[in-house]
Amino acid sequence: MNESERKIVEEFQKKTGINFKNEELLFRALCHSSYANEQNQAGRKDVESNEKLEFLGDAVLELFVCEILYKKYPEAEVGDLARAKSAAASEEVLAMVSRELNLGKFLFLGKGEEKTGGRDRDSILADAFEALLAAIYLDQGYHKIKELFEEEFELYIEKIMRGEMLFDYKTALQEIVQSEHKVPPEYVLVRTEKNDGDRIFVVEVRVDGKSIAMGRGRTKKEAEKEAARIAYEKLLKERS
């Protein structure tokens, strides 16, 4: 880590209260592949992306969620538990948890990802949270993950088991728009972009032909969901 990177790592720990014995693990968890690629091309060999940590974190998350489900819902059918596990470990939930941590603020992103709104993209936030879980697991063990996140995930899982999750931004936006404008929102693919070799879809959500928000994603569906989320939050803010 260089000095500017170390400051961000230290600020993350200060703001979240999640302290690391090995700060290099935290730094790696916060490094998106776009940033690692840029730094590697610039000659730095000490910067590794969070992809391997994400791989481990996916397994840690699955165990963590399954343990909560197994202990709290002993009478539930296996099929219901499996569906709840998928929902609790979904991109949407992980992105919500990441936003509560303000994780996006501390991510190291390449210039392209920064420019295209990667800091608030669900997929990047969800992947980074999985990487963070792995870093915590390696640094302090499984018990620390339970200490930090068990209560929060129990609340999400309770909502899921009651059928209250997941929050569907497209449906929520449609309800608001149709109640006020009597027409559904329209999703329009406006362009595709290249970012570190990846194809990024850019979708605009329109009401009565007027653009109200734009979203980006690795698939058209992901971009539509992101556009719906931004539009929904914007309309709620305007109402308040």
Curated annotation (Swiss-Prot):
Residues involved in Mg(2+) binding: E54, D127, E130
Subunit structure: Homodimer.
HAMAP family xrefs: RNase_III
Gene: rnc
The protein's name: Ribonuclease 3
Catalytic site positions: D58, E130
PANTHER family: RIBONUCLEASE 3 (PTHR11207:SF0), RIBONUCLEASE III (PTHR11207)
Any one GO molecular-function label of the UniProt entry: rRNA binding
Lineage: Bacteria, Thermotogati, Thermotogota, Thermotogae, Thermotogales
